[in-house]
């Protein structure tokens, strides 16, 4: 049961960090050209 809690905490933490970075720096991906 503890493993489930730890996994949930890990996933939620990663998700929060991911969303924080995503909203802080909105992905501006140019469809044409990498420059």
Swiss-Prot record:
Any transmembrane segments, and where? 3-23
Q: Where in the cell is it found?
A: Plastid, Chloroplast thylakoid membrane
Q: Which Pfam families match?
A: PsbT (PF01405)
The primary site where this protein sits is plastid
Q: Which GO terms describe its biological process?
A: photosynthesis
GO CC entries? chloroplast thylakoid membrane; photosystem II reaction center
Tell me the membrane topology, using the record's own terms: Single-pass membrane protein
Keyword Membrane listed? The answer is: yes
Q: Which UniProt keywords apply?
A: Chloroplast, Membrane, Photosynthesis, Photosystem II, Plastid, Thylakoid, Transmembrane, Transmembrane helix
Supply the InterPro entries for this chain: PSII_PsbT, PSII_PsbT_sf
Q: Does the keyword Phosphoprotein apply?
A: no
Q: How does it assemble?
A: PSII is composed of 1 copy each of membrane proteins PsbA, PsbB, PsbC, PsbD, PsbE, PsbF, PsbH, PsbI, PsbJ, PsbK, PsbL, PsbM, PsbT, PsbY, PsbZ, Psb30/Ycf12, at least 3 peripheral proteins of the oxygen-evolving complex and a large number of cofactors. It forms dimeric complexes.
Q: What does this protein do?
A: Found at the monomer-monomer interface of the photosystem II (PS II) dimer, plays a role in assembly and dimerization of PSII. PSII is a light-driven water plastoquinone oxidoreductase, using light energy to abstract electrons from H(2)O, generating a proton gradient subsequently used for ATP formation.
The entry assigns this protein to a family as follows: Belongs to the PsbT family.
The identity of this protein, by name, is Photosystem II reaction center protein T
This protein's species is Ginkgo biloba (Ginkgo)
What gene does this protein come from? psbT
